[in-house]
Amino acid sequence: MTSRILIPSLLVLALFSCSSEDTAQVQTSLSNEKYTQGVHYELIDNPTTVRDPSKVEVIEVFWFGCNHCYALEPYLARWKKEMPEDVSFSKSPATWNEMLKTHARMYYTAKALGIEQQFIPAAFNTIQNERRMLTGNTELEYFFMGFDIEREKYKSVNKSFGVSNAVDQADKRMKQWEITGVPVIIVNGKYRVGASRAVGTDGLFDVVNFLVEKEKRYSATN
């Protein structure tokens, strides 16, 4: 389990996830399953309902300013290429403070404008490599203009009810899931998986796949 980011920074020193303190690893209990609750994943106390019950829902909680989220992107891309049709994936931005809420609004604005796929790598690159935090109004206007989005169009969508509501919903989800660090993967609103020492970045999506299959078996028998 990870811990909450107290001061947003590009220079995060945690080993596996964007967090400010370590948590003692829980002892592995005897189990016939490959991965163990409390060690490799957590059960969410107050689970959320999925949008489409016919699919297993996988959601990544992330922040553009988190270098571990940036490092996870190629792993995520490979996993998505092999993602079964009965699994859905989406991103949900973290919203702990005003900077993160600005980035969450930026993300949902790009999504509403239909430029999400090209926007994500560009935003990560700008913040992580160019060290420009993309928080000022003028800076964001020019950034979106780089995607051929007119300034007034950007401003209109950025302040729209739809984008504001999306940010609010992301904030509610994050609190309900008790997210204390990113990146974190939520499986079917029930399970929380982070790149802890017990999991690591390489093993993260193996745990996700394990939980996806677990949910499929559960659905088949209920």
Can you describe what each PLM-predicted range is?
Residues 1-7:
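Bacterial N-terminal signal peptides that target proteins for export
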Residues 62-65, 80-83, 110-114, 123, ...:
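Sec/Tat-exported extracytoplasmic proteins
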Residues 73-80, 103-107, 120, 137, ...:
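Extracytoplasmic/secreted envelope proteins and their assembly/folding machinery
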Residues 70-73, 100-104, 198-201:
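Conserved strand-to-helix beginnings and helix N-cap segments that scaffold or border functional pockets
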Residues 85-145:
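Structural microenvironment flanking redox-active thiols in thiol-disulfide oxidoreductases
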Residues 65-68, 95-99, 125-130, 162-163, ...:
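Solvent-exposed loop/turn segments at secondary-structure junctions
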Residues 8, 13-98, 213-222:
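Extracytoplasmic thiol/disulfide redox context detector
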Residues 5, 147-222:
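C-terminal cap of thioredoxin/glutaredoxin-like
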